[in-house]
A protein has these predicted regions:
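Membrane-embedded alpha-helical bundles of multi-pass transporters/translocases
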Residues: 2-5, 12-16, 29-191
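Extracytosolic (periplasmic/ER-lumenal) interhelical loops and adjacent juxtamembrane/interface segments
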Residues: 17, 21-22
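Short, positively charged loop/turn segments that connect secondary-structure elements
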Residues: 25-27
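Intrinsic disorder in cytosolic terminal tails and internal cytosolic loops
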Residues: 193-201
Length: 201
């Protein structure tokens, strides 16, 4: 789910930026937000996790997965709220809405992505490691496919700017709700999942 939602950054969010975001710069610059945020926040999280670990408060891997999904869900909640409450007379929202969306997604990615692939190698049986890693990449490919299908739902169905932007609001609100429910499942079920992880934190 995380990657399906995150991959909207190169699909529907890109078109949303082009058509419905009022920014003092070219909309293509939003594609630089994720790598810029990674450069800024990856060192901070690299310091945060060991700091929490020394105090016995480092979230377990299942909880980090839940945090990542929750943050990507909140990113679409932010966009939906920006559309609902912040659409100007020209039918566009402020650029800060999309900047905040990418920020939440990037922090979620940093919480989930670095440990996800490594976890496959740690938990898979030695003779099945290659197969398990292939499954990880297959999941990414499937996420791209689903992301494309979700992106098609955001295409404008009306003749005015407001009717078109409403499609984005509805889809992103649904993504916010679905992502929040799944993330809560991860967070609440983390203790049970950890028991199946053979001592891996």
């Amino acid at each position: 789910m995380f990657w399906t939602f995150s991959f909207q950054g190169v699909t529907s969010l890109n078109f949303f930026a082009r058509d419905y975001v009022n920014a003092p710069f070219n909309y293509t610059l939003f594609q630089s937000a994720n790598p810029l945020y990674i450069l800024l926040f990856a060192p901070l999280l690299a310091l945060l996790w060991p700091w929490l670990s020394r105090r016995g408060r480092d979230p377990s891997t299942p909880r980090k997965f839940g945090i990542g999904i929750l943050l990507v869900a909140l990113s679409y909640g932010l966009v939906a709220a920006g559309i609902h409450f912040g659409t100007a007379a020209d039918g566009k929202v402020g650029w800060w809405v999309l900047a905040g969306c990418y920020l939440l997604q990037t922090i979620g990615e940093l919480a989930l992505s670095p440990i996800g692939f490594g976890l496959v190698g740690l938990l898979a049986a030695k003779e099945e490691t290659s197969f398990a890693m292939g499954g990880w990449f297959f999941g990414s490919a499937l996420a791209y496919q689903l992301a494309g299908r979700i992106a098609t739902l955001t295409t404008g169905s009306g003749t005015s700017a407001y009717s078109g932007i409403a499609d984005y609001e509805h889809v992103y609100l649904w993504m916010f709700a679905a992502g929040t429910v799944v993330s809560l499942g991860y967070l609440l079920g983390a203790p049970q999942v950890r028991k199946l992880m053979h001592g891996v934190h």
